Amino acid sequence: MDYKETINLPRTEFPMRANLSKREPGIEKYWEENNVYEKAIKNREGNKQFILHDGPPYANGDIHIGHALNKILKDIVTRYKTLSGYYSPYVPGWDTHGLPIEHKVTKEMGDKAKDLSVSELRDKCRDYALKYVERQKEQFKRLGVWGEWDKPYLTLNPEYEVKQIEVFGEMAKRGLFYKGKKPVHWCPSCETALAEAEVEYGEHRSPSIYVKFPLKDKVNVGGVELTPGDSYVVIWTTTPWTIPANMAIALHPEFDYVVVKASGEKLVMARELVDRVMEEAEVENYKVVGQAFKGTELENKRCRHPFEDRDSILILGDHVTLEQGTGCVHTAPGHGHDDYLVGLKYDLDIYAPMDNRGVFTEEAERFAGMYYDDVNKEVTKILDEKGLLMNLSFISHQYPHCWRCKGALIFRATDQWFASIEAIKEEALKAIHSVDWYPAWGEERMANMISERTDWCISRQKKWGVPIPVFYCKDCGHSIINDETIEAVKKLFAREGSSGWYKYSAEEILPEGFSCPECGGKSFKKEEDIMDVWFDSGSSHKAVLETRDHLSWPSQLYLEGTDQYRGWFNSSLLTAVATEGKPPYEAVVTNGFVVDDKGNKMSKSIGNVVSPQDVIKRYGADILRLWVASSNFKDDVRVSDRILKQNSEVYRRIRNTFRFILGNINDFNPGQHYVDYNDRAEIDRWIMIKLQDLIKDVTRAYDEYEYHRVYHDVHNFCTIEMSSLYVDIVKDRLYTDGTNSLSRRSAQSTLYDILLVLVKLVAPVLAHTAEEVWQHLDESSKDAESIFLTDWPEVVNEYYDDRLMSKWDKLLEVRKDVAKALELSRENKEIGNSLDARVILVPVDDKQRQLLKDNIDILPDLFIVSQVELQGETGEGFHKGSETGISVSVVKASGEKCARCWKYSEAVGNDEEHPELCERCVEVVRTEV
């Protein structure tokens, strides 16, 4: 007889090779055709809500690895919450307005762009945005991300724009908007103002100059008489092009200033900075004369502008520092925030003679028509000719750049619309402290950003966006925003979208008979600027959560990259506090940036960019998802081919665990064969208790957004508790015990229970693989058509048994000592397979002896040997175990090797019909064949 035919070998169609890149699209098709997402959400209707509100990616270009990280994290959250019983619909969104799209369209159009009407330009921008929405949508879906892909929110949709106008109107009603001439970050290349969130800081080379401003007034300070002609106040700047707009020099009221005598001149500067200034100016012979004096002693005294026909006033400002420079700060209110604020206090002119391209206007006279960067050289030349340039050098420093074109920015005063942050700052800070932040330092970071935030410049000098809904009276110039005008704009946008603003005159948009509330005038013009895109996306909590019946305000979670503390988290908080008095989110989770395995930023020029599309083609989306889960994503996340290969290896082990179980329950029908927990073998109960611990730990990790713990806990369970221990021990029972024996069905029941738990625990991460496993289960073994229509596993506390766990902890410690002895015997060629062995044990004490004696029947299976014997004394060939102190000897097993189970037994040969089999195998074969 061929005894191999009598062995219960594993059988499954679940493939060993994952081949994910080819298999996953079929699984995604199954989800789509069977409406798995829709059914999962419907199943949870009426349950407690958990709404993760999607921060909209920008509809421009293909998704990058940072997008993949963020979207997969969100998918893990919503899949887990849904499995856990929450009503957790996910509505993806896109940010579809703004400069990058307009920039791309005009660049593609070239010279033809100038001939486009506003409506034509906007139509082309809309088409461009929608093209990339569709492209990115397919890329996100290929990551395995589920959600309402057929009904996403787009910031260009009319219903969204209407809600945005409503938010604007509510804030206007509180008096939070004003128009003012203030310096803002300005991109001369893109020709528009930028918000703080659109500014990137990078290395920039700038001129560094020390300049002498001639003193105009006679004054005595520190016992030294300063007179016009030989006395100067020294300033330092890295923007010589702003000196034409200089109106004052700021000193700190509390700092000590001194007079320095050098080359017959008297120079005023901060005492603490004298040596550094003179060293950098390469002045060797100098001397401090008189005593130190406070900045207050020079307030309102006058210097002459170095080359313009006007004075430069000496003023006081707390913004002056001693970190660099001279302690005397060149002040141009039209070109700096601090300069502007101190200028208001002293009623200085907000002078910025430049156009939108960074070119000086006629107002600048000698510099008219020059680009600001060229003015640097011209100013330096003039100062040098007049003998007022103390020193010129060049420095590399962190400098603001445009997020879109990457060009250097300038500070420039222009007429802009602002939202007053000061008016709601206290409310916003209070709101921050009511939110749960992951990681916890996010709370302080956000609070600091809001505390330091200046008023929000919301106007942009572009066409592709939501127009600022303001009208101006042509008769008196009054700007008009009220309930009546807001309602008129909302009606227009609901009907035609924001493009309607450009189709009709102000009078056609406003209600019939509308008159200026200030002067009664009847002629109006519309504001030409559009809103900052951060106001677009910052209104999403109202535009999405309040307009969709199945969602609710506020959301339970915002989850974005750390750059959104100054971006979407920030703008959303401000609009929510301004309109609702509360934050729009109950919790905020942030992920770090993706870097290479050396911690370097991704860069095309370096060649270290990892594309999610390439990863999916090579490894599959589930490997990308596993990489996300393996990372402590709250810090920067490393990725490389080496790291992805490591994750592939971990995936292989998890997959092999599923395959082993599926193969060994192929003939198991839970309705007929399921063995109750209390009737199972002790090792089966032990692994079931370990499984309950796994459920607890993994559930807690998911709840705390600690997915790397899920990754490690599941991997350890598969490799340590399962592969290295339980699977090894039960293989003999599964393969060689009677097909329908209690011992085999007990092991199968346990494997079945483990599979049902394990596949659910990994489902939020390994979504495709979990579904694949589920579809390979026999219909009798599952209660739903998809893994994602099941419920999260619950801990069965009744399984816990301290006595059993204590006993098995001790037995498994002994097993470790036996395993080491077996390994030594293998190395010494004393045995081949562990089943060749007979293990002799000499316990360390009576307690250990009794434990082993009571369990002597299960020890061969536990150690995976043929025989185990207890002895009273050690002798030659014994090894003392490092775990328990037990003495272990390994000798050749007695008897003959069973042809069926490969265990040695003295009973082999006793049966005439089956002389090659041991007693156990004879009984099985006789019963079943």
Curated annotation (Swiss-Prot):
Cofactor field: Zn(2+)
GO molecular function: aminoacyl-tRNA deacylase activity; ATP binding; isoleucine-tRNA ligase activity; tRNA binding; zinc ion binding
Residues spanned by motif 'KMSKS' region: 601-605
Keyword ATP-binding among UniProt keywords: yes
Chief subcellular location: cytoplasm
Gene Ontology BP term (one): isoleucyl-tRNA aminoacylation
UniProt keyword annotations, A-Z: Aminoacyl-tRNA synthetase, ATP-binding, Cytoplasm, Ligase, Metal-binding, Nucleotide-binding, Protein biosynthesis, Zinc
Residue sites binding ATP per the record: K604
Motif 'HIGH' region positions after renumbering to this chain: 57-67
Disulfide bonds: none
Top class in the EC scheme: ligase
InterPro entries attached to this UniProt entry: aa-tRNA-synth_I_CS, aa-tRNA-synth_Ia, Anticodon_Ile_BEm, Ile-tRNA-ligase, Ile-tRNA-ligase_type1, Ile-tRNA_ligase, M/V/L/I-tRNA-synth_anticd-bd, Rossmann-like_a/b/a_fold
Record text on cofactor binding: Binds 1 zinc ion per subunit.
Amino acids binding L-isoleucyl-5'-AMP: E560
Superkingdom to which the source organism belongs: Bacteria
Subcellular location: Cytoplasm
Catalytic activity, as annotated: tRNA(Ile) + L-isoleucine + ATP = L-isoleucyl-tRNA(Ile) + AMP + diphosphate
EC code(s) of this entry: 6.1.1.5
GO cellular component: a single term: cytosol
Keyword Aminoacyl-tRNA synthetase: yes
NCBIfam families: ileS
Domain notes: IleRS has two distinct active sites: one for aminoacylation and one for editing. The misactivated valine is translocated from the active site to the editing site, which sterically excludes the correctly activated isoleucine. The single editing site contains two valyl binding pockets, one specific for each substrate (Val-AMP or Val-tRNA(Ile)).
Family: Belongs to the class-I aminoacyl-tRNA synthetase family. IleS type 1 subfamily.
Quaternary state and interactors: Monomer.
Protein function: Catalyzes the attachment of isoleucine to tRNA(Ile). As IleRS can inadvertently accommodate and process structurally similar amino acids such as valine, to avoid such errors it has two additional distinct tRNA(Ile)-dependent editing activities. One activity is designated as 'pretransfer' editing and involves the hydrolysis of activated Val-AMP. The other activity is designated 'posttransfer' editing and involves deacylation of mischarged Val-tRNA(Ile).
Protein name per its UniProtKB record: Isoleucine--tRNA ligase
Source organism: Halothermothrix orenii (strain H 168 / OCM 544 / DSM 9562)
